[in-house]
Amino acid sequence: INKGLPRSMELEYEGFYPAGIFVSTKGAEGGAKKKYALIDDKGRLKIRGFETVRRNWSFIAKDIQKEVIEMILRDHDPDKAYSHVKQVIADLRANKVPLDKVVIFTQIQKNIDSYHSVGPHVAAAQRLKAQGREVKPGTMIKYVVIKGKGKIRDRVKLDTEARQDEYDANYYIENQIIPSVERIFAVLGIDTESLSIKSAKKGAQSSLAAFGG
């Protein structure tokens, strides 16, 4: 292949990957895919651009995304992967997922006072600072989103403050679990809308309307 390329270009052999998943990124128009997962002939995964290799996500979201990729590429079983996601969602709703799995990790990029808008991670950093801890650019913040009303930033606690029965399952399902897998399933033509709590509520309302009709 290299013989047909310009002199300034040369391809290097990385390995043989029998299967892979390529997912488009929001806002990407053409060009190379920014998210992909490959499995080589020895069963080893190579993951680039997915939440499994990024911060700002909880362990449960990272774990389930990697497990879904493994079930699709290693087991060739998308249905098994989908059922697994449904089970994890059920466990979240039943408060069976351990607290340490819903902890969200993020890094403060600048001084707290420099943030014009207060997001959940900034609110958590403010709590940490209020405890007398030093918070500066590069500080790793660990927090949990708990149940309650109001904005998400008003419902965060540090991982050392939160209790097992406090975490907001709905938040993690809608903002962590589903976003971490929906584009993977979309590539396979599998709709994840039924996993959403909003979808479940619509279904319940439709059933009640039909019953009352």
Task: List the model feature ranges, each with a label.
Residues 1-213:
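DNA-dependent DNA polymerase catalytic subunits
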